[in-house]
Each structure stands twice: as structure tokens, then as C-alpha cells.
Amino acid sequence: MLQPKKTKYDKRHKGRIKGNATRGTKLCFGKYGLKSLDPGWITDRQIESARVAATRYMKRQGQLWLNIFPDKPVTKKPQEVRMGKGKGVRDHWVSVVKPGRVLIEVDGVDLLMGKEALRLASQKLPVRTKFIIKNA
């Protein structure tokens, strides 16, 4: 799974997702992409699942880029533990996504294959997405 090699602090505040994305809103590497329409947290497992779904469909053709990285730790307390006594231990990592952010890019495949690969990837993600084409 994706996670940072080293972090300055173990735990982070939950935070709020306000507004639209200002960075990463245009295609940089590929010809086709998947853009988020909703705000949300995407876990490391969901990112990996989307990547596997898209690459399996493309069958080693073309290239795929992940434009998001899970850099926010999410903590969880054990089951049946009373409230208080500090924050729980780090459970998994998430990527905070705002609307308008390009999540995945694909190149080196035709339009139909790229669209279907990204559709399969989008089914693994917890946010609504749309298919975008470079210069269209």
C-alpha cells in the first residue's frame, strides 16, 4: 500500500474540506484522465484497487499515472474501548481530495480503452468522477 516513508508527526487533525481544488486540475502527463466531482478522503487501499483495475484492463498497454498520494494518517481506537485516554493509534493513510482534482491519468491507448479503464477505476473510488480528455 502507498504511505509516506517518514513523517514529522504521527497524528493529524481531521480537518475540513472546503472549496474546489486549485492545484492538479489539468492533465499533465496523459491524454485521458479522471477528475473528481466531490470532496472526500481516498484511502491507500482504494487507490491501489483503482490502479489494479485500470492496469488489468489495459493489459500492459499504455501508461498510467496516479496524481494523488495518501499522506494523511487516520487513527482508530480499539473496539469496545471507553472514550478519552488519548487519540488512537494510526490505522491507515488517506489522500484528501477536493472537487476538480485530477486523480488518474492514462496515455498510450485508444479512446475506448482509456475510457473503459478509467470507468473501472472510478468504480473503486468513493467520490464521483468524470472522464476528461486533453485539449477538449
UniProtKB/Swiss-Prot annotation:
Q: Name one GO cellular component term.
A: cytosolic large ribosomal subunit
| SUPFAM superfamilies for the chain | Ribosomal protein L16p/L10e (SSF54686)
Q: Name one GO biological process term.
A: translation
Q: Which domain of life is it from?
A: Bacteria
In the record, what terms sit under GO molecular function?
rRNA binding; structural constituent of ribosome; tRNA binding
Q: Does the keyword tRNA-binding apply?
A: yes
Q: Does the keyword rRNA-binding apply?
A: yes
Any matching Pfam family: Ribosomal_L16
Q: Which family does it belong to?
A: Belongs to the universal ribosomal protein uL16 family.
Q: What does this protein do?
A: Binds 23S rRNA and is also seen to make contacts with the A and possibly P site tRNAs.
The record's note on quaternary structure and interaction partners says:
Part of the 50S ribosomal subunit.
Q: What is this protein called?
A: Large ribosomal subunit protein uL16
